Amino acid sequence: MKIVQITDTHFSPSIPHFNGNWQPLADWVNGSGADLVIHTGDLAVDGADKDEDLTFCMGLMQQVKIPMLIVPGNHDVGHLPGSLQPVDATRLSRWRSLVGPDY
């Protein structure tokens, strides 16, 4: 089994610093012959607070024609308790509804 691992893409419709990295990466992944892609977190810039960031990112991820698992990172669902964006049930529920299960 061939697995491609990607991480920390930090995509956003409103803060597009890294969005230009996507198309070359998606083209490479689709041509890689991989059986599975695992994105290991920080899919979005501010997915912890912005539905539109996660929705935008999932539109990009759908361009990959290989099965993909996405692990949420701190930019996706929040960070430590006491931080400005702590992980909580609301953020995790939103992630699951917009992205899918967390692994």
Which stretches of residues belong to each language-model region?
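N-terminal active-site segment of His-dependent metallophosphoesterases
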Residues: 1-56, 60, 100-102
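Extended active-site neighborhood of metal-dependent phosphoesterases/phosphodiesterases
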Residues: 52-103
